[in-house]
Amino acid sequence: MPRSAWRSDHDEEDNRVTASLTLPPEQSANCAYFFDLDGTLAEIKPFPDQVVVPKTILQCLHRLATQNADALALISGRSMVELDALTTPFRFPLAGVHGAERRDINGQTHIVNLPEVIEREAGALLHAALVTLPGTTLETKGMAFALHYRQAPEHEAALVTLAERITRRWPQLALQHGKCVVEIKPKGSNKGDAIAAFMQEAPFAGRIPVFFGDDLTDETGFAVVNRAGGISVKVGSGPTQATWRLDSVRDVWHWLEKNNSSQQEPKATNNRRGGYESFSRSI
């Protein structure tokens, strides 16, 4: 990866030297890592079900987690079921649907549930509306909906208007813009809060947070990491709150491979906590 691919967005604002290709040694041994998936660990495809994380990258993630006491989680707009399918055979802590569902290091799940009537009626309205917008697709996530227009960008404005109408009707819902997608999710759920929740728990607590993301949905995560004195990394172009930038998914892969080769395998540690029960939270 060329030196310019890994840079600080503040380098032009002061006299600091552009960062090297790996994190500073004094930080790398005590970090908690958070990664978005689509557009960060995996190339974006025309349809969500075409996305694949290379096996070598999954192995890099597993090794990075092992090197850092398992303090590594995936933070995504996808459901946890999808994330598990994309990262098998490994099982990482997860935050899915922009933080509306979360699985901690123990396997305990924290889920925001919408009233069934909202899921049913909102889903029916969205399905009927998208039938009239050729090329758009509706992805149902239980407590959330994704309106994709990558194949029909001319319908972006119509989908935004539709999503705004849905969120006005049901104030428990909020609109989230993304890359060629408009999402409707439980109000108050975001990636920043998910990262903050992980940072209060073992093995993440007390570590320096590092978050890689590529989309508008990742900005709340960057803000939380910045406030904690961590390292926020924007993948790709565009304005951002992140303080570092990698140019592409492939540069993330190269960073993972380089970081793996520069660290020694530590002794295994057990960060699980006993005596937990799964629970869900309703709004």
Each predicted region: which residue ranges?
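Substrate-recognition/cap helix-loop segment adjacent to the acidic, metal-dependent catalytic center
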Residues: 79-95, 155-174
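Residue-level signal for inorganic ion chemistry
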Residues: 39, 94, 147, 195, ...
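Mg2+-dependent phosphoryl-transfer enzymes with acidic/Ser/Thr/Gly-rich catalytic loops
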Residues: 3-6, 11-16, 28, 54, ...
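Substrate-recognition "cap/lid" segment bordering the active-site pocket of phosphatases
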Residues: 97, 103-124, 176-206
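Charged, glycine-interspersed solvent-exposed loop segments at helix/strand-loop junctions
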Residues: 136-153, 174-185
